[in-house]
């Protein structure tokens, strides 16, 4: 019985520690641009309908525009703002959205501060607070 109790305590401690290593907020604002916690610029896609709860960027699109994916246990309240919500992607993963629009990185941005995806094909734009 002592072994089971110890095992449960260790499991609970490990789970709690894992939760505490997640960033407090998935995004931040840097120079009036919304970025991920890694400092990389985030973008919105004109073809995504705000508030639809869906992303229209899947497959090859998502390879070029990786979504800002949430952890499996994320809750919208963790976003730190009422403007940050979660949507469910076609593959079942959760993605962060700003004002109802899913957020994406641009694969060609190489370092924090890059904004090379702004205006691509006239439908990709830097996410603004």
What are these regions (language model features)?
Residues 4, 8, 19-129:
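Compact beta-sheet-dominated domain cores in extracellular/mature segments
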Residues 10-12:
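Short, linear, compositionally biased motifs with a strong N-terminal bias
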Residues 15-16:
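Bacterial Sec-type N-terminal signal peptides, specifically the leucine/valine-rich hydrophobic h-region
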């Amino acid at each position: 019985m002592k072994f089971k109790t110890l095992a449960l305590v260790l499991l609970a401690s490990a789970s709690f520690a894992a939760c505490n290593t997640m960033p407090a907020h998935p995004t931040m604002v840097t120079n009036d641009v919304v970025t991920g916690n890694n400092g990389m610029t985030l973008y919105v896609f004109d073809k995504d309908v705000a508030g639809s709860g869906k992303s229209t960027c899947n497959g090859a699109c998502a390879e070029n525009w990786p979504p800002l994916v949430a952890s499996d246990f994320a809750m919208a309240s963790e976003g730190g703002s009422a403007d940050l919500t979660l949507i469910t992607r076609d593959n079942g993963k959760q993605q962060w959205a700003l004002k109802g629009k899913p957020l994406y990185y641009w694969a060609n941005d190489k370092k924090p501060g890059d904004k090379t995806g702004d205006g691509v094909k006239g439908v990709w734009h830097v996410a603004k607070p």
